[in-house]
């Protein structure tokens, strides 16, 4: 796994991947990565990446920053001779609205990490943190299931794309 908001810079990821390759002779796959497209919470269950004080420098909580982050991770992985990158978890959207009591929906249909039944086999992790989706603001679909424009980044990585330069966000400056 490589989550830039938890695991450091792309350069750090490259160094780790190269070190694994050099020491073990094994190539690396990045089996999980993601980034938020919003700081909103879609189901009332706290998000793992809030999209506020925990953002990566140079990236906002926007659809464009989500796409740019994915592109930058893939480019850095390619430079480090990483075999590939999987996005986690692009379809993890809420099962009910933020304002609803989602507990019954989470138990019946599942959502997020686990249901309460997981306490039987994983009491210290999933058994404590079951319920809604902590990843809904990092999906590649909005809270109602419509695809985000950032989903196109995978097509652009394969086939290329050109676009006019545009400002995604302007960071606040304090003096």
Regions found by a protein language model. Give the residues of each.
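A generic short-segment signal for beta-strand/edge and adjacent turn/coil regions
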Residues: 53-56, 122
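Alpha-helix N-cap and loop-to-helix initiation/capping positions
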Residues: 8, 12, 58-65
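Short, solvent-exposed loop/edge segments of extracellular or virion-exposed proteins
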Residues: 166-175
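Hydrophobic, well-ordered secondary-structure elements that form the walls
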Residues: 85
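Glycoside hydrolase catalytic-domain groove-lining segments
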Residues: 1-54, 71-82
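Aromatic-rich peripheral "rim/lid" segments of glycoside hydrolase catalytic domains that contact
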Residues: 40-48, 60-68, 88-166
